[in-house]
Amino acid sequence: MVEFCVLFGGASFEHEISIVSAIALKEVLKDQIKYFIFLDENHHFYLIEASNMHSKYFAQIKEKKLPPLMLTHNGLLKNSFLGAKTIELPLMINLVHGGDGEDGKLASLLEFYRIAFIGSRVEASVLSYNKHLTKLYAKNLGVKTLDCILLNEKNRANALDLIKPSFNFPFIVKPNNAGSSLGVSVVKEEKELAYALDGAFEYSKEVLIEPFIQRVKEYNLAGCKIKEDFCFSYVEEPNKQEFLDFKQKYLDFSRTKAPKANIPNALEEQLRENFKKLYNDLFDGAIIRCDFFVIDNEVYLNEINPIPGSLANYLFDDFKTTLENLAQSLPKTPKIQVKNSYLLQIQKNK
């Protein structure tokens, strides 16, 4: 049986969602999770007892006096009256949504300290956290995406002039750097634009404008690469109205099993082929979820979710086996052997 530790929390707008994800994953993996490591908004690490992994505990966590830990090589450092003690960690699951977890900070830190983990590596995190870069990446691979306009604080005042030549009302306003539907809105008329931009700029320094397309079909597909083969979840067709907002995506606790999409085999194969293009080889070591649109029988990438909620376990027929197999197929960074031969040669020639 493979043991795991789960890292969750973080200095992120999705801090609470990460907690919910960790609680949900506990119900799936149960005793396979040896440690729960909580990262607070001040970047302090804490060990949380499994018995405390429930919403009531975290609602009052600021009142708790927990001993902070320090990340070190291969584990965590815990100080006590007997001196410092290293807690060796089993394979870590990065379950920090949004900033810190999905933007590459934690991936960089874990790689630096040589802590083995399941999750997107630095380059994959940085790219997928930026929606505009994701579109450029996808187009370069031959995966279609919706056209967009990128706004920032400098051109924000001229937003309508930039949008009008390309898009009619309604259109979608969304933060460029964000890991969820926070700050996303549909603008149906000109008077709604300023408010929508205010909301989006709260979460990101850049904002994307995309066309809003009526009656678009949306499909989600999760998966990972294990050695040379892909392991896919089934395709989910979200039950939505206009689009999945923050509450629908994250606060629906009944989402233990998602509705399976009733689609032709040919469309499922198209979704899988697009997923493979996006995953290879950038996302090695991670379970990701790709959210697709189907418009006029054409497949478009909506976004790549590098750390889906609870690792999208609800989409897999056998999530535990998938996770255990992935644990045996993680990318390895070769250790550099420093020989100092050049310095020795300098000394020899003196």
UniProtKB/Swiss-Prot annotation:
Pathway stated in the Swiss-Prot or TrEMBL entry: Cell wall biogenesis; peptidoglycan biosynthesis
Binding-site list for ATP: 164-219
Subcellular location(s) per record: Cytoplasm
Cofactor (UniProt): Mg(2+); Mn(2+)
Keyword entries, A-Z: ATP-binding, Cell shape, Cell wall biogenesis/degradation, Cytoplasm, Ligase, Magnesium, Manganese, Metal-binding, Nucleotide-binding, Peptidoglycan synthesis
UniProt record similarity statement: Belongs to the D-alanine--D-alanine ligase family.
Domain annotation ATP-grasp: ranges: 135-335
Reactions accelerated catalytically: 2 D-alanine + ATP = D-alanyl-D-alanine + ADP + phosphate + H(+)
Superkingdom assignment: Bacteria
Positions annotated to bind Mg(2+) 2: 303, 305
Annotated Mg(2+) 1 binding sites: 291, 303
Source taxonomy: Bacteria, Pseudomonadati, Campylobacterota, Epsilonproteobacteria, Campylobacterales
Enzyme class, first EC level, given as a word: ligase
Record bears the keyword Manganese: yes
Disulphide linkage map: none
Protein name, UniProt field: D-alanine--D-alanine ligase
Documented EC number(s): 6.3.2.4
Function: Cell wall formation.
SUPFAM superfamilies hit by this protein: Glutathione synthetase ATP-binding domain-like (SSF56059), PreATP-grasp domain (SSF52440)
